[in-house]
A protein has these predicted regions:
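ATP-dependent carboxylate-amine ligase
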Residues: 1-113
Length: 113
């Protein structure tokens, strides 16, 4: 499906995620880079956002389109800026961090509630 969308990569390296993030170099992000024309925004966040942005650069993403967003509140603003669907690819703890931020603004409860 070639529908336009936003894509967000959230990379943490906390204990529950695994502190070794070298696995990002084994993932075929090049396949996504070949489809990058359909991404209206390429968002990167998380504790290791800079490492993720670097990996996307080497995968062939246009670095001028990669947006590193340091906090989840601003990330949610970017995601909600329009009605374009967003695909979020988080590591384990990033998923819970983002869900916690979402719970501040919606009826969705934080995972532990």
């Amino acid at each position: 499906d070639e529908e336009e969308c936003k894509i967000a990569f959230l990379l943490n390296d906390r204990y529950a995620d695994g502190t070794d993030i070298s696995w990002i170099w084994d993932v075929d992000f090049e396949a996504l880079a070949r489809q990058s024309a359909r991404f209206t925004r390429i968002l990167v966040s998380g504790v290791r956002a800079d490492d993720m942005a670097l990996r996307l650069k080497y995968a062939g993403f246009d670095t001028g389109r990669i947006e590193v967003i340091r906090d989840y509140e601003n990330l949610l603003e970017a995601i909600g800026a329009d009605e374009t669907p967003t695909f979020i690819m988080p590591t384990y703890t990033a998923m819970f961090d983002l869900r916690g931020e979402i719970s501040k603004h919606t009826d969705i409860k934080a995972f532990y509630e």
